[in-house]
């Protein structure tokens, strides 16, 4: 083995197996691009993003860790969200929850 080398088993790696997901239509009504990271509480994203915010409470983007989705001005797209796991307590971000979900 070479230091730092990955030895990945063949086949697909499934993310977030068995967790609740929801698909939402999201539009950027602003005049600047908005980028949302993989573990950002989607409910608390920039107010220029228009979508069913209540349906996104306690959820994040269902994408690989360390990646992000970019919404260009005027762009609309379908995104998939997945339930946050762990203790289901949210602090920080935009400060809209600050505690248990």
Curated annotation (Swiss-Prot):
Pathway: Nitrogen metabolism; urea degradation; CO(2) and NH(3) from urea (urease route): step 1/1. InterPro entries: Urease_beta-like (IPR002019), Urease_betasu_sf (IPR036461), Urease_subunit (IPR050069). GO terms for cellular component: urease complex. One of its GO terms (biological process) is urea catabolic process. Its EC number is 3.5.1.5. It is found in: Cytoplasm. It holds the Pfam family Urease_beta. The keyword Hydrolase applies. Disulfide bonds: none annotated. Keywords: Cytoplasm, Hydrolase. The keyword NAD does not apply. SUPFAM superfamilies: Urease, beta-subunit. Its main location: cytoplasm. One of its GO terms (molecular function) is urease activity. It is an enzyme of class 3 (hydrolase). It catalyses: urea + 2 H2O + H(+) = hydrogencarbonate + 2 NH4(+). CDD domains: Urease_beta. Belongs to the urease beta subunit family. Heterotrimer of UreA (gamma), UreB (beta) and UreC (alpha) subunits. Three heterotrimers associate to form the active enzyme. This is Urease subunit beta. The lineage of its organism: Bacteria, Pseudomonadati, Pseudomonadota, Gammaproteobacteria, Pseudomonadales.
